[in-house]
């Protein structure tokens, strides 16, 4: 099935973002991105069509396979565009945790990593932030999952190692704060961004 695309280039005047707050973003596999405010976007576009894609592949329907892949690509791009646009419109600074996606693509998590679209989302956030005149930072996300965003400790109760990947909620054994795994990481990423900006360190 042939596909035709009509592209129109227009010049628009970028409007500065009216936002005053900063947010941290944790990139993940279960959710493509989790914001320090608690907002999340699921990134399972491929998974939604995996069954239909498998049927088409086994039946050797090449046109159907191409059509499904095109649909997945368009849904991913549209979802990430909407998510990134809303963030940039409302915030004054966006801090993203650095993820070694190139390494994960070579592991058994490759399919989920590619489906999440981290690189695409980061690129969208970066150029949209630049257009809106807001701060965009990428920070080292080491220990952001294990560190309690409330008291700053790395308690024994925090998720660690491969076994910790299954833990979605945990309680800090030091201050008794209950954490959503990804929201906690996003809050720590935001804190790391504040420290970098306060020290005048440039973007990674």
PLM feature spans:
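Positively charged, helix-rich recognition surfaces that bind polyanionic ligands
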Residues: 1-204
